Design a protein with these regions (language model features):
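Consensus positions within tandem repeat domains that build extended binding/scaffold surfaces
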Residues: 8-13, 31-34, 54-57, 77-80, ...
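Structural signature of tandem-repeat unit edges
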Residues: 1-6, 16-29, 39-52, 62-75, ...
């Protein structure tokens, strides 16, 4: 009837055979899910005085093709037009200040969006999976783009300039295959996780963004044309895999950076990392396979270096981590074949194979604070000559110095009780070793192949020795074993 001002919630929901509907011009509101699931609804022109379209109101009305949203609209509820496949253009009028999450979700016929309402936030998922959108015009008032707002808009190339933009939500522009330009981001503070993941054509420099605090995990994963990580005075966090494919030869002037997530800068283009005075956390694989990296500046506050953090950084010569009170994860520096000297005096924990295959490493200044040392920690550091004081360990791990062929100077602590299997195997250059009176067990092959050992004195405290402990020690001229060894 002409006097009708509202259509109640769910009134025609799932009326699958419903075809064109004519509504009176005086209609002010279409309730939640009013026509949801009316899959054959072909036409439903919105009246000129309409103020509200409820949540899911036209959900899955696949053939619904009324393009014009009246200027009187002030609210569109969440998922109101989801999967309305025949929509080709959307204009958000100046009065339409309340648009719900996913309002046009998967409307893959839309090609053009003109958002005139002066909103500050673009809702989550509002145009998610609108694959064929080519043009988007957003108001200059926007300061935040919600999560997944333009996710998988595969034909989108340009979204204009956002001089006031402070936050881009997670996956906001993820899988936008043709996106090239996102304009000015001078006010940006946070770029959410996966915000631009797989946007291979995106051209963007991050240099000089004065307010940027957070780059979320995978934010620019798979974005080879993203460049620059210099002069970012507010940056505090780089998330996991955030810049793994970007073109970033230098990291410099990041005075507040505290955290680099897993694989955050695992980047083959990276050559130099400047001083990071606030850095505390280096995540697993953070610089893994950064095969061009030569210099890592001073980072005196680091407390954690994750597993594989610098794995295969074969050109890394300068490492500004001397004296840090850190925990070092397994394989953290494995195969860093250009490192020559390390001061680990304040390190408390070193994981398995942390420095294995560091072939040019000559000196470890000290291990005096160590409370946990993993097996194979320095295996095949073939140039290692000197290991400073080792902390109060009770067990020297298996193969910890195996194949350290140049090792000539190492001092075991008087807390040592067990020398592990093959701990010094094939340390050909080791001329002497003092086994503390605290040692009770020497496991098999512990000193096997130490061909330079001249004197072997096993203290009376040792009650158990494995097979071939001193096998191949052919230079030994004096050997003393305990009287009661079993």
């Amino acid at each position: 009837p002409a006097s009708l001002t509202g259509i109640s919630a769910h009134m025609f929901e799932n009326c699958e055979k419903l075809v064109p509907v004519t509504v009176p011009e005086g209609l002010l509101e279409i309730g939640d899910s009013a026509f949801a699931g009316c899959k054959k609804l072909e036409n439903c022109p919105l009246p000129p005085n309409l103020t509200r379209v409820g949540s899911y109101a036209f959900d899955k009305c696949t053939l619904w093709n009324a393009e014009l949203l009246p200027d009187t609209l002030t609210e569109i509820g969440e998922y109101a037009f989801r999967q309305c496949k025949k929509l080709t253009e959307v204009t958000i009028g100046e009065k339409l200040l309340n648009v719900g999450e996913g309002a046009f979700y998967d409307c893959d016929g839309i090609k053009k969006v003109d958002w005139q309402a002066k909103v500050t936030r673009i809702p989550d998922r509002v145009f998610q999976s609108c694959y064929y959108i080519e043009t988007v015009k957003l108001p200059e008032t926007v300061t935040e783009i919600g999560e997944y707002s333009f996710y998988s808009c595969g034909y989108l190339t340009d979204i204009g300039t956002f001089e006031r933009m402070k936050r881009i939500g997670a996956c906001a522009f993820s899988n936008c295959d043709e996106l090239v330009n996102i304009g000015t981001l001078d006010a940006i503070e946070e770029i959410g996780g996966g915000a631009f993941i797989s946007d291979q054509k995106l051209v963007l420099s991050l240099d000089g963004l004065q307010h940027l605090r957070i780059i979320g995990g995978y934010a620019f994963g798979g974005c080879p044309k993203v460049t620059g990580l210099r002069d970012l005075p507010a940056l505090e966090e780089i998330g996991a895999s955030a810049l793994d494919s970007a073109n970033i030869p230098e990291v410099a002037n990041l005075p507040r950076l505290r955290r680099i997530g897993a694989s955050g800068l695992s980047n083959r283009s990276l050559v130099t990392v400047g001083d990071l005075p606030s850095l505390e956390y280096i995540g697993d694989s953070a610089f893994r396979n950064a095969t061009s990296l030569t210099t890592f500046g001073a980072a005196p506050k680091v407390t954690y270096i994750g597993a594989n953090a610098f794995e295969e950084c074969r050109k890394l010569e300068t490492l500004g981590l001397d004296g840090v009170a850190a925990e070092i994860g397994r394989e953290a520096f494995i195969a860093c074949t250009s490192l020559k000297s390390l001061d680990l005096s304040n390190v408390t924990s070193i994981g398995e194979k942390a420095f294995s295959y560091c072939g040019t490493l000559e000196t470890v200044v000290s291990l005096e604070s160590i409370t946990s040392l993993g097996k194979n920690a320095f295996e095949e550091c073939r140039s290692l000559v000197t290991v400073g004081k080792i902390g109060n360990l009770t067990r020297l791990p298996n193969e910890v110095f195996r194949e350290c062929k140049a090792l000539a100077n190492v001092t075991l602590p008087d807390t040592m009780e067990t020398i592990g299997t093959a701990a010094f195997k094939h340390c050909y250059g080791l001329p002497e070793i003092v086994i503390p009176d605290s040692v009770t067990t020497i496991e098999e092959e512990a000193f096997s192949g130490c061909t330079s050992l001249k004197e072997i004195i096993v203290p009376d405290s040792v009650v158990k020795m494995g097979n071939h402990v001193f096998g191949g020690c052919r230079s030994a001229t004096r050997i003393v074993f305990p009287k009661y060894l079993t």
